[in-house]
């Protein structure tokens, strides 16, 4: 499955920071039960890659990717953990080379027109727009549509349940990344029913 196909499966990709690997399986199951079956686990904790491995082994109904890939070596670790896609906050020649050798498709991050051109030159036409809200949000994505009609985006960063629909209404947006689907307090309390409810609400934002 290529990255466009993966992104097309969901309106919202939960962007997850997992501090305790014991949370990984019930979290993935709760999100999937709520209808969100494409997940991004960020490389921001020591538990991230073990969490991805646990989800791959035990929650077959989800597609799980690894985010915050910032060094070429990160691609190897993500591949060993079983990542089904990767996400970077930006794109360098070194990261592009690592991605070509990876066993999974990449969603590279961009913020400016120059970065869109560079990513497209490297062969990417589905891009993470990051950090979406600080970079210009909906207005900038609208401006990018005319010069880049062949490029689709997954905006991530600063998006809320209240603003997600405005992004999803744009023709050049496939889906959005959301950090609100797994609040730290819910993870600590093991409130999987609450997380499932958040996922169900987010799934209802599906593009028309």
Predicted regions, residues:
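Shared catalytic-loop signature of beta/alpha-barrel
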Residues: 118, 139-160
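Glycine-rich phosphate-binding active-site loops on the catalytic face of alpha/beta enzymes
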Residues: 85, 89-95, 128-138, 172-194
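Short beta-strand segments at enzyme active-site cores
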Residues: 39-42, 65, 88, 109, ...
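Mobile acidic interaction elements
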Residues: 135-137, 142, 147, 163, ...
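Conserved N-terminal beta1-alpha1 strand-loop-helix module at the mouth
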Residues: 1-85, 101, 150, 161-162, ...
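Glycine-rich beta-to-alpha transition loops that act as phosphate-gripper elements at the mouths
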Residues: 17-21, 66-72, 88-92, 108-113, ...
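Histidine/lysine/aspartate-rich catalytic loop segments that bind and position anionic ligands
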Residues: 92-126, 130-135
């Amino acid at each position: 499955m290529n990255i466009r196909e993966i992104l097309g499966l969901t309106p919202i990709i939960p962007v997850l920071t997992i501090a305790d690997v014991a949370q990984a399986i019930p979290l993935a199951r709760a999100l999937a039960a709520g209808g969100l079956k494409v997940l991004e686990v960020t490389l921001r904790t020591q538990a991230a890659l073990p969490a991805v491995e646990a989800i791959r082994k035990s929650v077959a109904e989800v597609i799980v990717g690894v985010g915050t890939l910032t060094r070429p070596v990160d691609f190897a670790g993500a591949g060993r953990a079983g990542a089904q896609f990767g996400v970077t906050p930006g794109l360098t020649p070194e990261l592009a080379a690592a991605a070509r050798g990876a066993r999974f498709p990449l969603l590279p991050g961009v913020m400016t027109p120059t970065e869109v051109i560079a990513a497209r030159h490297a062969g990417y036409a589905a891009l993470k727009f990051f950090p979406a809200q600080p970079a210009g949000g909906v207005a900038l994505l609208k401006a990018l549509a005319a010069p880049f009609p062949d490029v689709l985006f997954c905006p991530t960063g600063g998006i809320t349940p209240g603003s997600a629909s405005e992004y999803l209404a744009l023709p050049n947006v496939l889906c959005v990344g959301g950090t609100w689907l797994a609040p730290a307090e819910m993870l600590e309390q093991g409130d999987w029913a609450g997380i499932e409810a958040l996922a169900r609400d987010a799934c209802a934002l599906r593009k028309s």
